[in-house]
UniProtKB/Swiss-Prot annotation:
<dbReference type="InterPro" id="IPR006158">
    <property type="entry name" value="Cobalamin-bd"/>
</dbReference>
<feature type="domain" description="B12-binding">
    <location>
        <begin position="1"/>
        <end position="137"/>
    </location>
</feature>
<dbReference type="GO" id="GO:0032259">
    <property type="term" value="P:methylation"/>
</dbReference>
<feature type="binding site">
    <location>
        <position position="187"/>
    </location>
    <ligand>
        <name>[4Fe-4S] cluster</name>
    </ligand>
</feature>
<dbReference type="GO" id="GO:0046872">
    <property type="term" value="F:metal ion binding"/>
</dbReference>
<dbReference type="Pfam" id="PF02310">
    <property type="entry name" value="B12-binding"/>
</dbReference>
<comment type="similarity">
    <text>Belongs to the methyltransferase superfamily.</text>
</comment>
<feature type="domain" description="Radical SAM core">
    <location>
        <begin position="169"/>
        <end position="409"/>
    </location>
</feature>
<keyword id="KW-0408">Iron</keyword>
<keyword id="KW-0411">Iron-sulfur</keyword>
<feature type="binding site">
    <location>
        <position position="183"/>
    </location>
    <ligand>
        <name>[4Fe-4S] cluster</name>
    </ligand>
</feature>
<dbReference type="InterPro" id="IPR007197">
    <property type="entry name" value="rSAM"/>
</dbReference>
<dbReference type="InterPro" id="IPR006638">
    <property type="entry name" value="Elp3/MiaA/NifB-like_rSAM"/>
</dbReference>
<keyword id="KW-0949">S-adenosyl-L-methionine</keyword>
<dbReference type="GO" id="GO:0008168">
    <property type="term" value="F:methyltransferase activity"/>
</dbReference>
<keyword id="KW-0004">4Fe-4S</keyword>
<dbReference type="GO" id="GO:0031419">
    <property type="term" value="F:cobalamin binding"/>
</dbReference>
Length: 426
C-alpha cells in the first residue's frame, strides 16, 4: 500500500489487548506491511501534528468501556478542538464494549464511525478502504450517521481465533493470549455473550503453543489468558468440562517454559465458574500453574437472585468450589455483585451469611456494585447500591483486605451510567 494513510491507536493499559488483536490482524496481511502505525499513550495522543502534516488521512482508533464514557467524551472533544485544522484528514473510529453496545450514542459523542463487535475482519477492511479512497461506509460491521440517520452495515459471522494472532509480533507488542471467545451463559448483567455471541470458540492448543514459544524466545515468561471461563477451555458447548484439553494446554505450555516461566490460569483475566471447580480441575492448577489462588464468580448468596440473573449455577456450587480449592491449599477470591435487580433485604441477609461462611472457610470476598450496561437485559434496571448491612457485617474484614474492591466508586459510576442509558444524556 502507498503510505498516504496512517493509523493511530489509543494504546492504554485497559485496552492494549484489544488493539493487540486488531494490529495482529493487520500484520498477517502483507497489504499493510508499510502501514504507519502509532501506538499513542495519554500524552502522545495530543502530540500528533507531525503525523497529521505528513499523511493525507489519519484514522484515530479509540476503544472504551461504559465506565469510561465521560472521560472518552472529554477526550474526543479535546482532540477535535486541538486538531480542528486537520479535521478533513481525520477519521475518529470507536470500538470496544461500549461502542458495540451503544453505537448510536457513541456516534453522538463525536466519533465518525463505530466498529461493532469483533474487529479482526472489519478493521483491516476499513483501513484498506480508507487508504484506497473507496467508500468505507460499505464495509460490513460498522455504524455511522448519515444526516443524523443511524446506519448499520450488518453483523459479521464470528471469527476463527486460529486465523489471527493474539498480538502483533512484528510490532513487538505482547500481552495476554485469548484462548476462548463467546459465552454460552446468558447472565443478564454481562455484555460478553451479546458482543461475542453464545457459541464458544477456542484457539487450538498448537496455535497457543506457537505464541507462547514466541514470548518465551523474548524472555516473556509470565503467561496469562483471556477467556470468559478458564475451565471451559476445549469444551464443545462451554459448559461440559474437557479435562483432557485443559491438561494438554497446560502441559504443552509447561514443556516450553520449564521451571523458568509462570502460568496463570483461573485468575484475572481468566476467572472460573463455581460449578467447574472440582478435584480434577484444581489438580491441574496445582500440577501446571503458578497461581496460588482461584478467582470464582459467585455474584450472589441468594438462589432467587442467581435465577433472576440467569447465572446457571447454585449457591451450593459456590460452597463446593471454595471447599475443594481450600482443601487443596489454594487461596480463593470470590466475586459478589451487590444491588442486583430484584435483590431484597432477605436476599442481602442470605448473601451476608454466605460471605461469612466463605470467609470462615478461608476465602476472600471481591466486592462489586451492579452497574447497568448497554445491550444487556439489565440495561434499564436501576443502578446498584450496596446495602449498609453488608458494610456493617464486613467492617472487620475490610481493614484486613478480606473484603475488598472498589464498590463505592462503582456505586457512583452506576448512577451516572443508569441516567445515561435511560435518558441518553451524559
Amino acid at each position: 500500500m502507498e503510505e498516504n494513510t496512517a493509523l493511530v491507536v489509543y494504546y492504554t493499559k485497559l485496552h492494549k489487548n484489544s488493539f493487540n488483536a486488531l494490529i495482529g490482524a493487520l500484520e498477517i496481511d502483507e497489504y499493510f506491511d508499510n502501514l504507519p502505525i502509532y501506538f499513542a499513550n495519554k500524552k502522545d495522543i495530543f502530540n500528533l501534528k507531525e503525523v497529521l502534516k505528513k499523511y493525507d488521512k489519519v484514522v484515530i482508533a479509540i476503544s472504551f468501556f461504559t465506565t469510561e464514557l465521560w472521560k472518552t467524551y472529554e477526550l474526543i472533544n479535546e482532540l477535535k478542538a486541538k486538531y480542528q485544522s486537520y479535521r478533513n484528514k481525520i477519521i475518529y473510529l470507536a470500538g470496544g464494549p461500549h461502542p458495540t453496545g451503544d453505537p448510536k450514542g457513541t456516534l453522538k459523542l463525536g466519533f465518525d464511525v463505530v466498529c461493532i463487535g469483533e474487529g479482526e475482519e472489519t478493521f483491516p477492511e476499513f483501513i484498506k478502504a480508507v487508504n484506497e479512497d473507496e467508500d468505507y461506509k460499505k464495509v460490513k460491521g460498522i455504524a455511522y450517521l448519515n444526516d443524523n440517520e443511524f446506519i448499520y452495515t450488518g453483523r459479521r459471522k464470528p471469527v476463527d481465533l486460529n486465523k489471527y494472532p493474539p498480538f502483533p509480533v512484528k510490532h513487538n507488542k505482547f500481552g495476554h493470549i485469548e484462548i476462548t471467545r463467546g459465552c454460552p451463559y446468558k447472565c443478564y448483567f454481562c455484555q460478553t455473550p451479546r458482543i461475542f455471541g453464545k457459541k464458544i470458540r477456542h484457539r487450538d492448543v498448537e496455535n497457543i503453543y506457537k505464541y507462547v514459544e514466541i514470548m518465551a524466545e523474548r524472555n516473556l515468561k509470565d503467561i496469562r489468558f483471556i477467556t470468559p471461563n478458564a475451565f471451559g477451555y476445549g469444551s464443545k458447548d462451554g459448559k461440559t468440562l474437557n479435562i483432557d484439553k485443559i491438561e494438554k494446554l497446560l502441559e504443552s505450555i509447561r514443556e516450553i517454559l520449564g521451571n523458568n516461566g509462570r502460568i496463570f490460569f483461573g485468575t484475572f483475566p481468566s476467572e472460573v465458574r463455581p460449578e467447574h471447580v472440582n478435584i480434577e480441575t484444581v489438580d491441574l492448577i496445582l500440577r501446571y500453574a503458578d497461581n496460588k489462588n482461584l478467582v470464582i464468580g459467585a455474584q450472589s448468596g441468594s438462589e432467587k437472585v442467581l435465577e433472576l440473573c440467569h447465572r446457571g449455577h447454585t449457591v451450593e456450587d459456590v460452597y463446593n468450589a471454595v471447599r475443594v480449592a481450600r482443601k487443596a491449599g489454594l487461596g480463593v477470591d470470590v466475586d459478589f455483585i451487590f444491588g442486583l435487580p430484584g435483590e431484597t433485604e432477605e436476599d442481602v441477609e442470605k448473601t451476608i451469611k454466605v460471605m461469612k461462611d466463605l470467609i470462615k472457610m478461608g476465602a476472600k470476598i471481591h466486592a462489586h456494585t451492579f452497574m447497568p450496561l448497554p445491550q444487556t437485559p439489565f440495561a434499564k434496571a436501576n443502578p446498584g447500591k450496596v446495602d449498609k448491612k453488608i458494610i456493617r457485617a464486613m467492617r472487620y474484614e475490610i481493614p484486613k483486605g478480606i473484603f475488598h474492591g472498589t464498590w463505592h466508586n462503582q456505586e457512583i459510576i452506576a448512577q451516572k451510567i443508569s441516567k445515561y442509558l435511560k435518558t441518553g444524556k451524559l
